[in-house]
Each structure stands twice: as C-alpha cells, then as structure tokens.
Amino acid sequence: MNDVDIRHLQRCVELATEAVDAGDQPFGSILVSRDGTVLFEDRNRTGGGDATRHPEFAIARWSAEHLTPEERRHAVVYTSGEHCAMCAAAHGLVGLGRIVYATSTPQLSHWMQELGKPSLGITLLRIIDVVPDADVAGPVPDFAEEVRALHARAVS
C-alpha cells in the first residue's frame, strides 16, 4: 500500500459519502489504468430500488464495454468496501486486475450487527471466496471509523 493507493481510496470514501447524502448505501469505487489514469468512478445507487446498482458492478460492465482484455487485466479497482459476491463475480468474469479496498466484508458484517441492521438475506462472502486467485489488498485501518460512521448514517 502506498500514497497513491491511499489517495484513490480517499476518493472512494468521498464517493461513498456522496452516496449516503443521496439516500444510497455508502459505497464508492474507481477504476484506474496501468498508467494511473482514473478511467471510471461511481457510487452506490441502490436507493432507487435496483439492488444491483453497485459501483463495482458498474465498473465491471463499463470495463467490458470500453477496455481490451489486457487493459482490464492491468487495471486496478479501488473501493471503499470489499466487493460483495455479485461484484466479485463480475470482476472475475470480465478479467479485471487488482482490487484495493478500504474496509472489509468482516468489518461490514460486524458493523451491521452493532447497528442492529437486519441481514440482507444473502451470505456475505470475501472476494477470495468468489475469485480465489484475485489480487487483493485491504483493509486499511485508517479508514475504518470514517466508513463505519457512513454506514451508521445510512442505517439511521
């Protein structure tokens, strides 16, 4: 983990904040090319009723339409929270590269229990449970309290 990774993760947390401010769940993600160019960014948009409007899923779809397999393989996805199973599968299926996340699935699960939020009705899996050979880095402890506070805001 280096300063560039931290800067990109901070942008993801900013996008997650925008999501909460808009009534969506606190997740934000960006796609960065091999040369460091931010290619795509998005935030969660599930508040409108479509539970699949995750930023990581949007990145997978965008990259499949706009990047070559080699460009996808060398791109890095930065995200405020570790991918869910749906997004991890999409990531693996389109052949995206490294994933760097600020907070993990176990952290999210713990926070949801603490906040009294009911289960989503699905099993929360780690990225490596879905894409065993995925190149992942995270969580980053410095982001835990800020992201937990966003989840608390979203629940209230």
Language-model segments: residues:
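Short beta-strand scaffold segments in enzyme catalytic cores
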Residues: 27-33
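A short, polar/charged loop-to-alpha-helix boundary motif
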Residues: 48-58, 62
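Local cysteine-cluster metal-coordination motifs and their immediate loop/turn environment
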Residues: 80-97
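Zinc-dependent deaminase
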Residues: 1-19, 92-156
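Short beta->alpha transition motifs characteristic of CBS
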Residues: 39-46
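Immediate flanking context of iron-sulfur cluster ligation sites
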Residues: 69-81
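Short, flexible loop/turn motifs enriched in small residues
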Residues: 22-26
